[in-house]
Amino acid sequence: MTLRKLLALSCLLLPMIASAHKFETNQRVPPVGIADRGELILDNDKFSYKSWNSAQLPGKVRIVQHIAGRTSAKEKNATLIEAIKAANLPHDKYQTTTIVNTDDAIPGSGMFVRSSLESNKKLYPWSQFIVDSNGIARKAWQLDEESSAIVVLDKDGRVQ
């Protein structure tokens, strides 16, 4: 599957996945910074976190996946994520950014959500995983609770 086909498929699915949002076509996503937890970093088999900001999004074509820290939200995007994996897109031009809202997780499951993210980071070290412990991105982007949203960005970080 080519990058162009993947982006076309994503754009077709976008209205079904993200109904309420604050995204505008050809604009950057509303600014958001996540300092509590933030981006999951894997360095020499050790995990750490660093602050993350949406200003870091330009530079590559991206699919930004924002999901509640719930299995039901993750399952909504499973078909698209499998298509991305199968497409074997070049890591120097494409990146998936997954923002997980652990503030919107089933009580007591946050530890399991973070463990799952760590496993995925080991499998897909080129992907970006962001832990949003306070639901900052969901609030800034006006997303539905207990759900997911997919946003396709061009290399300049503009919504497509």
Question: For each predicted feature, which ranges?
Answer:
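Cleaved targeting-peptide boundary
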Residues: 20-28
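A short beta-strand-turn-helix
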Residues: 32-61
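Structural microenvironment flanking redox-active thiols in thiol-disulfide oxidoreductases
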Residues: 65-120
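A short, hydrophobic beta-strand/beta-hairpin element that forms part of a small beta-sheet core
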Residues: 148-160
